């Protein structure tokens, strides 16, 4: 089982699909990496030689941010928006959608489950 960027790639899948198990690599990036290294995308990941795995590792390490490094960058970008106090930052702070969606009836995923209304005592 090949281990790239701290992720164990599944054995029985094509290399193109197996690389998408790494956070930050989708189908397009996977195809770009394999084209750069010169590996057939339909090759099964357990058929990769150690040299091919090392080539893939080098390309990923040099060209792309993946896994923890990418997660850190994304969270820092969101934190920066919140510190700036811009509209998007305020929406993140309030846990509301920040891309213009309606919130009157929808946005339950972002807002969380409904809270029961508190009745006033008479």
Curated annotation (Swiss-Prot):
Record has Translocase as a keyword: no
Record-stated family: Belongs to the universal ribosomal protein uS13 family.
Biased composition (Basic residues): 108-122
Entry keyword annotation includes Chaperone: no
Subunit structure: Part of the 30S ribosomal subunit. Forms a loose heterodimer with protein S19. Forms two bridges to the 50S subunit in the 70S ribosome.
Matching NCBIfam families: uS13_bact
Protein name as catalogued: Small ribosomal subunit protein uS13
Assigned GO CC terms: cytosol; small ribosomal subunit
Function: Located at the top of the head of the 30S subunit, it contacts several helices of the 16S rRNA. In the 70S ribosome it contacts the 23S rRNA (bridge B1a) and protein L5 of the 50S subunit (bridge B1b), connecting the 2 subunits; these bridges are implicated in subunit movement. Contacts the tRNAs in the A and P-sites.
Lineage top rank: taxon: Bacteria
Primary gene name: rpsM
SUPFAM superfamilies tied to this protein: S13-like H2TH domain
InterPro entries: Rbsml_uS13_C (IPR027437), Ribosomal_uS13 (IPR001892), Ribosomal_uS13-like_H2TH (IPR010979), Ribosomal_uS13_bac-type (IPR019980), Ribosomal_uS13_CS (IPR018269)
HAMAP family, per the entry: Ribosomal_uS13 (MF_01315)
Single biological process term from Gene Ontology: translation
Keyword line: Ribonucleoprotein, Ribosomal protein, RNA-binding, rRNA-binding, tRNA-binding
GO molecular function: rRNA binding; structural constituent of ribosome; tRNA binding
Segments for region (Disordered): 95-122
Pfam families, A to Z: Ribosomal_S13
């Amino acid at each position: 089982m090949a281990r790239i960027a701290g992720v164990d790639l599944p054995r029985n899948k094509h290399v193109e699909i197996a690389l998408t198990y790494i956070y930050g690599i989708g189908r397009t990036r996977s195809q770009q990496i394999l084209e750069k290294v010169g590996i057939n995308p339909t090759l099964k990941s357990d058929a990769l030689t150690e040299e091919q795995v090392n080539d893939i590792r080098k390309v990923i390490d040099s060209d792309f941010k993946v896994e923890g490094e990418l997660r850190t960058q994304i969270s820092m970008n969101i934190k920066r928006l919140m510190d700036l106090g811009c509209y998007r930052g305020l929406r993140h702070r309030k846990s509301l959608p920040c891309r213009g969606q309606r919130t009157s009836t929808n946005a339950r995923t972002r807002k969380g489950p409904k809270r029961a209304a508190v009745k006033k005592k008479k």
